[in-house]
Amino acid sequence: MEGADLAVKLLSTWLTLVGGLILLPSAFGLSLGISEIYMKILVKTLEWATLRIQKGAPKESALKNSASVGIIQRDESPMEKGLSGLRGRDFELSDVFYFSKKGLEAIVEDEVTQRFSSEELVSWNLLTRTNVNFQYISPRLTMVWVLGVLVRYCFLLPLRVTLAFIGISLLIIGTTLVGQLPDSSLKNWLSELVHLTCCRICVRSLSGTIHYHNKQYRPQKGGICVANHTSPIDVLILATDGCYAMVGQVHGGLMGIIQRAMVKACPHVWFERSEIKDRHLVTKRLKEHIADKKKLPILIFPEGTCINNTSVMMFKKGSFEIGGTIYPVAIKYNPQFGDAFWNSSKYNLVSYLLRIMTSWAIVCDVWYMPPMTREEGEDAVQFANRVKSAIAVQGGLTELPWDGGLKRAKVKDTFKEEQQKNYSKMIVGNGSPNLARD
C-alpha cells in the first residue's frame, strides 16, 4: 500500500506541475519564460558542440559542407545548348553521350526524390538519428550527448507525451461535445475556443517555438490560406495563431479519429483523393464556403503531400480555380533542433510523433504574406505558380515545377514524350535546311 500511495502522490505532483506551469499558461496563450530559458541553453549547447566538432574533425566538416550543396556539379543548360558541342548539323551517334550524362545525373542525385527524405545537416545536432556523417570527437562531447539522451528520453518525452495526450483528448472530447449543439454563433465561438486551446497545448508538447511575421496579413474570414506542406504539425503551427476550416486527405488511425471528431464542430472538408466524385464535391463545398464572409478562412496545402522543407513543389490548380482571395503563408522549420518532416511512406503518425517528441524542439518561422487575387487573363495554373513563387522566395525555399505526387507514383510517360518531341524538333529543324540546300 505504501508503494501505491507513493506512486499516486508522485503522479498527482507531476500532473499538478504540468497543469500549473505548462497546461494553463499554454491554454491562454501565455508563457512563463521556461521555454525561452530552455532554448537559450539549447542554442549555447549546440553552438559549443559545433565548435568542438569543427575543431576535432576539420577535414570531415569541410567535406560535409561541400556535400551539402550537391554531390555532383549539374549541367543546367537546355538540350539545344548541351548538344551543340557534341554534334554537327544532323543526328549523330555521339548524341547518346549527352542523354547518358543526363541519365547518370538523375540517378546519382535527382532534384525530386531527395525532397522526400529528411534534410541533411551541416553540423551534428547531438541526436543519434542524425549521427551519420559525424564520428567520435572527444570525451566531453560524448558526455554531453549521453546527458542529452537522458534529458530527452527520461524527462522531456514523459512530459511531452502527457501534454500531447491531454491536448488530443481535450480536442476529441471538446469537438464531439460542441458538435452536438445546434448551429449558432455560440457553437462557432466554442468550436474556435476548443481548437485554439488544444492546438496551443499540442504545440507545447513539441517544445514548439514559433516566430510569426507580418501579422497584419493574417488570413481573414471568407478567404483561402495556402501554405507549403512539411508535416501534419503545420496545422498546429498555424492554428495556434488563428482558427481555420481545413481541407485535406482522409486518414486512418489516430489521424482519422481526430479528423472525425473535428468535423463535428467545424465545417472541415475531408476527401479521398482517388475518388473523382469527392473532388467535385470538394470544389462545390469550397465555393459555398468562401461565398460566406462570416466563415473561417480555409486552410489548404496545394502541394498535396509533405515535402522536406527545402523546396516548394507544384501547386495543384484546383485551389486556385474557385475564386476568392488567396492568403499565402510560408513556413520554414529550423532542422538544427529537430526534423519536422513527415516521411509518411516510412513512419506512421504515432512513430512520427515519437520521433519529434524525442527531438530537442520544433522551431519555425511563419510569414504571413499580402493577399493575392487572380489577375485578368491569368489562368489557374499561372496563378498557382505565382503564389508558389512568392512563398518560395519568402521562405528561402527552392522552387520546383515537379508534382509532389511523384512521391508515390511513377513518372508519367508524357514527361518522357516531351523530351523526345524536343529532340525530334531539333533534328527536323537542323535537317530541313540541309535538305533545302541539296
Curated annotation (Swiss-Prot):
Belongs to the 1-acyl-sn-glycerol-3-phosphate acyltransferase family. Pathway: Glycerolipid metabolism; triacylglycerol biosynthesis; Phospholipid metabolism; CDP-diacylglycerol biosynthesis; CDP-diacylglycerol from sn-glycerol 3-phosphate: step 1/3. The keyword Phosphoprotein applies. It is a multi-pass membrane protein. One of its GO terms (cellular component) is endoplasmic reticulum membrane. Keywords: Acyltransferase, Endoplasmic reticulum, Lipid biosynthesis, Lipid metabolism, Membrane, Phospholipid biosynthesis, Phospholipid metabolism, Phosphoprotein, Transferase, Transmembrane, Transmembrane helix. It comes from Mus musculus. The HXXXXD motif is essential for acyltransferase activity and may constitute the binding site for the phosphate moiety of the glycerol-3-phosphate. Converts glycerol-3-phosphate to 1-acyl-sn-glycerol-3-phosphate (lysophosphatidic acid or LPA) by incorporating an acyl moiety at the sn-1 position of the glycerol backbone. Also converts LPA into 1,2-diacyl-sn-glycerol-3-phosphate (phosphatidic acid or PA) by incorporating an acyl moiety at the sn-2 position of the glycerol backbone. Protects cells against lipotoxicity. This is Glycerol-3-phosphate acyltransferase 3. One of its GO terms (molecular function) is 1-acylglycerol-3-phosphate O-acyltransferase activity. The gene is Gpat3. SUPFAM superfamilies: Glycerol-3-phosphate (1)-acyltransferase (SSF69593). Its EC number is 2.3.1.15, 2.3.1.51. It is found in: Endoplasmic reticulum membrane. It holds the Pfam family Acyltransferase. Most abundant in epididymal fat, followed by small intestine, brown adipose tissue, kidney, heart and colon. A motif (HXXXXD motif) lies at residues 229-234.
